[in-house]
Amino acid sequence: MAAIELDGVTKRFEDITAVSDLSLTVDEGEVFGFLGPNGAGKSTTINILLDFVRPTSGTVTVLGHDTREESVAVRERTGVLPEGFDVYDRLTGRAHVEFAADSKAVDADPDAALERVGLADAAGRNAGGYSKGMRQRLVLAMALVGDPDLLILDEPSSGLDPAGAKEMREIVLSEAERGTTVFFSSHILEQVEAVCDRVGIMEAGEPAAVDSHHHLRAASGAHAALRTPRRPPLHHAPPPTPLAPDRAAPVRSAP
């Protein structure tokens, strides 16, 4: 069964086409890499999946729900790690997860959630003293509250050193082993090839290829990164909080 289905999706902002005729299927339990340079339409696609913006044309189904009709049901079963989201310096790691649980109105063991992302020993520390990698993992722990069926990760390795990026990939693999579907957006192929079953590439808002990372790497001459923007990125509202579906906001395109 498909976890994500997009059929002929196009999104225009006045005279700018952010996404053009995108058709894509992600199976349940799959780790899908969504690649493209900044401004390629990745963040707009994520916003469409979460019904933060409506497509100009096309249909979108997530976890069996039509996003236009059942967006709340989609967000209740989806955990989001948005690009650029930061933590509250004066709150402990445990308090962040407790707040996430309260916002989602679910029962959750904060220490168990932090254990899943390797932060059990830092649960009582204020997040202001966390490293960049620890902050990213804390936001992921918040996204995991409620055991979502789908994880959407928007540039989860952005700003991380190699060790931090490796830790993030290991967590993604661990969640995939639990049966979670993962939609992993990035502009660097090497960040997703170790964890993803398939990879889709976006260029200038259009789908360029969907295949295994092995075939895509061979076809691209072993290039590891997709860094050159085809056009300036679109800027939308600030990134969404991973806490409460009814208070989330659209994902912001990377500057």
Predicted segments, located by residue:
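Residues that form or immediately flank small-molecule/cofactor binding pockets and catalytic motifs
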Residues: T67, S212, P250
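Short, flexible cytosolic linker that couples an ABC transmembrane/permease module to its adjacent nucleotide-binding
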Residues: A112, H213-L216
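Short, charged/small-residue-rich alpha-helical element at the C-terminal edge
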Residues: H215, G221-P255
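Short, surface-exposed loop and linker segments with low hydrophobicity and enrichment for Pro/Ser/Thr
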Residues: D89-L91, G133, R217-S220, P255
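Intrinsically disordered, low-complexity cationic segments
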Residues: G64, S186, H214, L234-H235
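ABC transporter nucleotide-binding domains
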Residues: A2-L6, K11-E203, P207-A209
